[in-house]
């Protein structure tokens, strides 16, 4: 059910937030392209967030992310609410030092973007 939740969450990210359809996971590459068109030098780098589920400092954020994914996926796919709730229960059970002996890792895809105005041509 990870794929169901991921697809529903990504679709939810792309919903209109009042300014037209949002870009969701495509936001960083789209911004990079527009910045390059406007004369910027752009660097993109993958920088996934890696949360250790057994780590007390990471577990609250992991739980909040999983809760948010559940909420967004359920809003996007109301007919799959029961399936998403079961997914949530399985995933949330792995968070915290008392529930994840030896740990596990939650990885959230993320992209950093750095842009600087390209130097003027000295031709």
Residue ranges and their predicted role:
Residues 1-46:
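Conserved catalytic/acceptor-binding region of the Class I
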Residues 28, 62, 66, 107-108, ...:
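Short runs of predominantly hydrophobic/aromatic residues within well-ordered alpha helices
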Residues 108-123:
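Core SAM-dependent methyltransferase catalytic element
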Residues 43-99:
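C-terminal helical/coil "lid" or tail adjacent to the Rossmann-like core of SAM-dependent
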Residues 100-105:
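Short proline/glycine-enriched turn/loop segments at secondary-structure junctions
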Residues 6, 12, 43, 58, ...:
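Histidine (H) residue identity feature
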């Amino acid at each position: 059910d990870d794929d169901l939740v991921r697809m529903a969450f990504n679709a939810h990210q792309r919903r209109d937030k009042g300014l037209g359809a949002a870009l969701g996971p495509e936001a960083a590459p789209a911004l990079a392209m527009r910045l390059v068109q406007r004369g910027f030098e752009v660097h993109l780098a993958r920088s996934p967030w890696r949360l250790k589920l057994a780590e007390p400092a990471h577990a609250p954020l992991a739980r909040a992310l999983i809760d948010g994914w559940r909420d967004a996926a359920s809003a996007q796919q109301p007919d799959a609410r029961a399936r998403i709730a079961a997914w949530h229960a399985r995933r949330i059970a792995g968070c915290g030092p008392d529930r994840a002996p030896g740990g596990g890792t939650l990885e959230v895809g993320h992209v950093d973007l750095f842009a600087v105005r390209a130097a003027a041509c000295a031709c």
